[in-house]
Amino acid sequence: ISSDYGGNGVEWDPYDEAEAWGAEVSDADWAKLSERLDFMRPGYVRCMINSPYRYYDAATGRYDRMRNLASLRRLLQYCQDNGITVAYGEYNPPTWAMKDSQQWVEMSVDYLNFLVCDLGFDCIRHFIIFNEPDGNWASTDGDYDLWRSMAQRFDAEMARYPDLKRKVSLAAPDVVMSYKNPASEYDTAGWVARSAQDLGAQIGIYDVHAYPGQHEVRSGAYAEKLRRIRAEVPAGKKL
């Protein structure tokens, strides 16, 4: 038993495409989701959005925080009502060309503040700025320096909203175990170590993604890899 264990959790994204396609999740399906989650009793939820299906209209470049809000609001309400900690974030910038855009930083943080402070969803405790930024499938393509710079800019923008900054911290670096992008200088442990060195005060919780197979788990190799990564996390911080 570990006091650092936060419980089992789930990835629960808010069906971004469904609303945009005019095929919203039905009330019956929401009831089924609630019933299943009631049984699971997750300790936390990771909720990621695609901004072009939410606050950013790619056709016009317009920012609209009320756009396609219903399903995200319903998901967060369930988490709020049931005391579930949420790590919320964005898979990628609105367009890949905006991966280092201050416009994205400002829109994204304003939207986060809207969710947490205006709508009252302070179940959101952590904010993820890129999904798996070490991956060659990400807009960052393993560029640690770009990711670090954006993390610093996001944190600085969050500081402009004092209530938000008090309630929400970064979850990082959100990288993939057992993977090394040839374009990146660092492996998983290296990303965690460098982010701790460069952003230790800004990161509230450290997170990595793991996709282990049965043999890796049963052989003990997976636990050993986790120990190596955990060793890079500063004392007093969770992974």
What are these regions (language model features)?
Residues 74, 204, 211-239:
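Glycoside hydrolase catalytic-domain groove-lining segments
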Residues 130-132:
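Active-site neighborhood of divalent metal-dependent phosphoester/pyrophosphate hydrolases
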Residues 1-126, 135-136, 141, 145-179, ...:
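Non-catalytic accessory regions flanking glycosidase/transglycosidase catalytic cores in CAZymes
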Residues 88, 208-209:
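Short beta-strand->loop
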Residues 108-111, 180-199, 218, 222-226:
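Distinct, well-ordered alpha-helical segments
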